[in-house]
């Protein structure tokens, strides 16, 4: 990771948690010390967002796991960026592979969500990544560019890019126990950074944080974190365990 980009670790709880379990995790996070060069975020299910934001120290961000592309209306089951901000949260995860593959969200819909979330003042973790069959067909770069291009078409200014973190999450490594090698992760992250150099406003390529998601654990995080273009992690299952605090410290000495 470049020293000019602040290390970023997000914990995506997915559809997990209870008030009792949450209290235990929040206690661990509240007692943990993260240095000034590390930014930490957790994304609980939406029903817990308000309660957790009120009880967790402000240094740790709280994110929603999803939102819709308009501010209000007859969209049963959806929440809007305005609602997320209204309860004190300032981040949202969009484009996660589970939203794409289980719920059928298209590149265009995800891009529209990103555009609206940014317009409403949220910061965004924008997820991209390929499936195993796409990797085996040597389509990793093609898929990532297709997904990223849809998002980039909706973001016009360098100022908006400052509120975006890109999460590269190879779908074949999510919840499978498989993990991209540090070299594989660096290769894709470096490719993405070069793509930004020619497809985004001047300077975005050096400043944007590109984080890795896919079976990150305390055992493999340090080696991954040493890669020049890996600026942090989006953590799934391990974010529900005490080891999450160790992952957050992957670059602390």
Curated annotation (Swiss-Prot):
The gene is TPI. InterPro entries: Aldolase_TIM, TIM_sf, TrioseP_Isoase_bac/euk, Triosephosphate_isomerase, Triosephosphate_isomerase_AS. Antigen to the host M.1 monoclonal antibody. Homodimer. Pathway: Carbohydrate biosynthesis; gluconeogenesis; Carbohydrate degradation; glycolysis; D-glyceraldehyde 3-phosphate from glycerone phosphate: step 1/1. Its main location: cytoplasm. It is found in: Cytoplasm. Its EC number is 5.3.1.1. It comes from the Eukaryota. One of its GO terms (cellular component) is cytosol. GO terms for molecular function: triose-phosphate isomerase activity. It catalyses: D-glyceraldehyde 3-phosphate = dihydroxyacetone phosphate. It comes from Schistosoma mansoni (Blood fluke). Substrate binds at residues 12, 14. Belongs to the triosephosphate isomerase family. This is Triosephosphate isomerase. The active site is at 96 (electrophile), 169 (proton acceptor). Keywords: Cytoplasm, Gluconeogenesis, Glycolysis, Isomerase.
């Amino acid at each position: 990771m470049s020293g000019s980009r602040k290390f970023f670790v997000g914990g995506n709880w997915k559809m997990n948690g209870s008030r009792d379990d949450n209290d235990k995790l929040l206690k661990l996070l509240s007692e943990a010390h993260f240095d000034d060069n590390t930014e930490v975020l957790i994304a609980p299910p939406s029903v817990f967002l308000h309660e957790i934001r009120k009880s967790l120290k402000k240094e740790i961000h709280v994110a929603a796991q999803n939102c819709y592309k308009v501010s209000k209306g007859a969209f049963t089951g959806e929440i809007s960026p305005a609602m997320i901000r209204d309860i004190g949260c300032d981040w949202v995860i969009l484009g996660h592979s589970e939203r794409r593959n289980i719920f059928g969200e298209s590149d265009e819909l995800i891009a529209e969500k990103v555009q609206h979330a940014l317009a409403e003042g949220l910061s965004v973790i924008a997820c991209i990544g390929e499936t195993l069959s796409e990797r085996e067909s040597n389509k990793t770069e093609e898929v990532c560019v297709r997904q990223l291009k849809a998002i980039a078409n909706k973001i016009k200014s360098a100022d908006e890019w400052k509120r975006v973190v890109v999460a590269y999450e190879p779908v074949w490594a999510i919840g499978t126990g498989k993990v991209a090698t540090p070299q594989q992760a660096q290769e894709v992250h470096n490719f993405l950074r070069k793509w930004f150099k020619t497809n985004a406003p001047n300077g975005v390529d050096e400043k944007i944080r590109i984080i890795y998601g896919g079976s990150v654990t305390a055992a493999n995080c340090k080696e991954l974190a040493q890669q020049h273009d890996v600026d942090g992690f989006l953590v799934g299952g391990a974010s529900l365990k005490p080891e999450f605090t160790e992952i957050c410290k992957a670059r602390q000495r």
